[in-house]
Amino acid sequence: MAAKSKTPPPVDSLTRSQARVEHKRLALEIETHNERYYQQDAPTVSDATYDALQRRLEAIEARFPDLVTASSPTQTVGAAPARGFAKVQHAVPMLSLGNAFSDAEVAEFVERIRRFLKLGADDMPAIVAEPKIDGLSLSLRYENGDLVRAATRGDGFTGEDVTANVRTIADVPHKLNGHNIPTACELRGEVYMLKEDFLALNKKQQEAGDTVFANPRNSAAGSLRQKDVSITASRPLKFFAYAWGEMTDRPAETQNDMLEWLRDVGFIVNPLIQLCHSVDEVLAFYRRIGEQRATLGYDIDGVVYKVDRLDWQERLGFVSRSPRWAIAHKFAAEQAMTILRGIDIQVGRTGAMTPVARLEPVTVGGVVVQNATLHNEDYIRGLGNDGQPIRDGIDLRIGDTVVVQRAGDVIPQVVSVIIEKRPANAKRYEFPDRCPICGSHAVREEGEAVRRCTGALICPAQAVERLKHFVSRLAFDIDGLGEKQIQEFYDDGLVMHPVDIFTLQERDARAENKLRDRDGYGDVSVRNLFAAIDARRRIELNRLIFALGIRHVGEGNAKLLARHYGSIESFRSAMTEAAAAQTEAGNDSEAYADLTNIGGIGDIVADAVVEFFAEPRNVKALNDLLEEIEVLPVAQARSDSAVAGKTVVFTGSLEKFTRDEAKASAERVGAKTSSSVSKKTDLVVAGPGAGSKLKDAEKFGVKVISEDEWLKLIEG
């Protein structure tokens, strides 16, 4: 570690805020040195330097005792860095909000509340209005005032445990201050990044040759989910608190007073929040925030309105996955004019060639936009997907003045051309008939708007994206082998095909330059990587089929194919037969007919699967892979179970299953699952926090059972 030229200020001169920031920095620095010393046997500082860091941390904690935590280096030694995220069930689901896009919809939201609560025509419920931060939702659990767990929102019911990472965020108190602290509580808010910090981070990433982030929200989310906690600590993350979940003793009776309480216990609450007493006040706040939007230091994508009285919130309850007592008033899509400087082609995992506009940089909604999607070649020509004219049939040309639109998280897009400003030298764009990456022919299938590269596995663009898909969560899901590592290994020629992942350890043993000698690696991380790869040498058939990256074959279709064929041998044999017959005699083979007769698999999916197996290089890649892995046959669903053939809906927070595991348990006993309750539903399995689906079950006369009853039913 390079010596710092500037002497830090004396501890006695630090303010509490300065001390808190330095305390976190010192704790992370010491933990990093502990890891290098205790885990890697590779210290990078002298004992004297390490002792000086430790003494300064102790001095800060002596002056500010409330900064001491159980995880402080003064209390423990050498905690290992996070290597993955455990699942966390939210005690109270983190639901989404309904949206309003007009003043009339906001007025109707207030009117619905008034009707539901049976208020008089002149009675206006007080409404708390607050900016809608464009970040990552986070739930913080405190017990006896101490932060014990932090979790991302996830699917609303199950999130990722990011406690170690969150402890590095200066805005998140490790201990709640003051009085009136509940025994247990879940406090919630948004992790975000300031615009100026985002730009500085991207500049640093670019200079280091690392991936840059698309926007502040993505950078905040990516920074929080780092497996190396020191990376999170190095990122300038912020946190606004604005809500809560489970709480043993609620300290206030209104939304506004709860926000004040959050401030009192140590959180930063957005200062722009306002209590409104009329629809006019609410809409005036919305317009004022909209006018300030570009000057704020952080991204917002609307305004959130919440009923102030908490007892009214409880009476109003929830509908579907959102509360009746709150709504998000989204900003209208924002537009700006700029110059179209060029058009590039991006090649995706399936070979889809997508045109991207390169624009003169322009600020749209407070965000600098330099690129925008152009969808496909018809869009450039002024035609929609139905072949009908769009933009009055005006094509896009290099040099045109165009209108760019950005709406929320949607990728910026070119929506119109200012034809009056078209220069005489504006250049027509000719869509390429060859892949710009590998030079293979690009073809456009009948009825499709997309042109695709036919290079398959020989196209570097597709190869990298296919490999990233291969290791994705629903496919092989190899811990420690994510998109960054795949790109790095591909660039260095270590992993060019799926099978290379499973021969990596063998080749590394023979290599002169070992993986452990690379930047960011070491003996421990390499051992863990190889162990994670070995753990995936046995995989379910549906995961393998999904991992192949066949067009139109997502998670659901992969399961349908796996259930039908049962084993990789049957699947491979049938598809090879269908592919051979397609070459010789069209699509009249018995194997093809069997494929199209699978419920849910139509001609489009069937053709895509057969086309995959008709490419010899794809078959070779699969055969090579099967030499290294074992594909588990599909367990046949029980036909003798009490729920065989029944339709089951799971709702609420499940304690013994994740949602995916619950669905799998139903499928194993021959049941079907659905996401909604209807007349066709046979059974609802309800956990804590179940909402409207229980009412629907009562409405349709559907039997409701608990999770424990479900377990007894399927195990019987």
Swiss-Prot record:
**What protein name does the entry list?**
DNA ligase
Stored Gene3D superfamilies: 5' to 3' exonuclease, C-terminal subdomain, 6.20.10.30, BRCT domain, DNA ligase/mRNA capping enzyme, Helix hairpin bin, Nucleic acid-binding proteins
Q: Where does NAD(+) bind?
A: D47, A48, T49, Y50, D51, S96, L97, E130, R153, E190, K306, K330
Broadest EC class? ligase
From the UniProt record, list the reaction(s) this protein catalyses. NAD(+) + (deoxyribonucleotide)n-3'-hydroxyl + 5'-phospho-(deoxyribonucleotide)m = (deoxyribonucleotide)n+m + AMP + beta-nicotinamide D-nucleotide
Under the heading Pfam families, the entry gives: BRCT, DNA_ligase_aden, DNA_ligase_OB, DNA_ligase_ZBD, HHH_2
Q: What is its EC number?
A: 6.5.1.2
Q: Where is the BRCT domain?
A: 638-716
What's the source species for this entry? Nitrobacter winogradskyi (strain ATCC 25391 / DSM 10237 / CIP 104748 / NCIMB 11846 / Nb-255)
Please give the superkingdom of this protein's source. Bacteria
Report the CDD domains cross-referenced here: BRCT_DNA_ligase_like, LIGANc
Of which family is this protein a member? Belongs to the NAD-dependent DNA ligase family. LigA subfamily.
Please tell me where Zn(2+) binds in this chain: C435, C438, C453, C459
List the InterPro entries hit by this protein, alphabetically. BRCT_dom (IPR001357), BRCT_dom_sf (IPR036420), DisA/LigA_HHH (IPR041663), DNA_ligase (IPR001679), DNA_ligase_AS (IPR018239), DNA_ligase_CS (IPR033136), DNAligase_adenylation (IPR013839), DNAligase_N (IPR013840)
Q: Which GO terms describe its biological process?
A: DNA repair; DNA replication
| Cofactor(s) needed for function | Mg(2+); Mn(2+)
Taxonomy of origin reads: Bacteria, Pseudomonadati, Pseudomonadota, Alphaproteobacteria, Hyphomicrobiales
Enumerate the UniProt keywords alphabetically.
DNA damage, DNA repair, DNA replication, Ligase, Magnesium, Manganese, Metal-binding, NAD, Zinc
Tell me the function of this protein.
DNA ligase that catalyzes the formation of phosphodiester linkages between 5'-phosphoryl and 3'-hydroxyl groups in double-stranded DNA using NAD as a coenzyme and as the energy source for the reaction. It is essential for DNA replication and repair of damaged DNA.
